[in-house]
Each structure stands twice: as structure tokens, then as C-alpha cells.
Amino acid sequence: MIFETLDTSGHEQVVFCSNPDAGLKAIIAIHSTVLGPALGGVRMRSYVDTQAALTDALRLSRTMTYKNALAGLNVGGGKAILIGDPATEKTEAAFRGFGRYVDSLGGRYITAEDMGTDVNDMENVYRETEYVVGVHQVHGGSGDPAPFTAYGALQGLMATLNRKFGNEE
């Protein structure tokens, strides 16, 4: 089933990452690099099986392609999934191992914080690769992206209200 899913997904590259000693099981999905390197966060959560994690990674990476293009960014779309419960299975070793996989892609994929991960996790990824955004400001990063995400969501709501009701206030 996994290969059938990959054959019809239209993705450029999918990487399965495994390091049992580090507790790492992950999937990196690169949907498109037409506009530039694939950019998208890494989320950590439990899945019923690998197929469910793959399906999520493919769906989310495709969405990132469109989201980044609509935002006018010179980046493509990608997404990564760390399979595991962030409350009980999150380790420095897993994120550093993931960082080595990201680094092996040579800049084709740039990762960032997403559901189940935080700035400290991105710091562990950063210890292994430069292809990560959202690290602490002392390392030249933007830090926690939550305020920017909230602002973007607010702007989207305001634009929707303006479109519906014609009032810019």
C-alpha cells in the first residue's frame, strides 16, 4: 500500500528516517522544489500505523506547496512527521537524528516547528543542520513562531470579514 500511495502522490521525494537507538521514526515528504527549497514544519504525534503517518505527511507537504506559493515565497512545499507521542517519546537524540537526515538532503528541505514540537526541539535539530528555522534568537532565529501564526490567522479573518461585509475596520 505504501508504494501505491507514493506512485500516485506527485511528490518529488519521500525519505523514511529510522534510528532505533535514538528512538527516531520519521518521514520527510518533499512535494515541490519548483519555487525553491521545500519549507514546512515537522510535527510529532502518534499514528495508528506508518501508512497513516505517510498519508498525513503527503497531504501536509502538498498543502505547504500551495500555502508558500500563495504567500509569494520563493520556497516549495515539504513536511516531516516524527512518529511518537510528544508527551512521552520526545528525546534530544531523536531530534538530532532527524537533523542529520535533514542535513543529508543538502538544503532541498528546510524544517521548522509544528504541532508537538517547540523551539527547544528545533535547537536540537540545529545542532546537526543549518536547514532549520525557528531556533532561538541568540542563534539568529525568529524564536517561537506562534505570535506570527496568530497574526497571520487574524489577518486572514479580517480579510474574510472585509470581503463579506465590505468594511475595512
Identify the meaning behind each predicted range.
Residues 132-169:
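Hydrophobic, well-ordered beta-alpha structural blocks that scaffold small-molecule cofactor pockets
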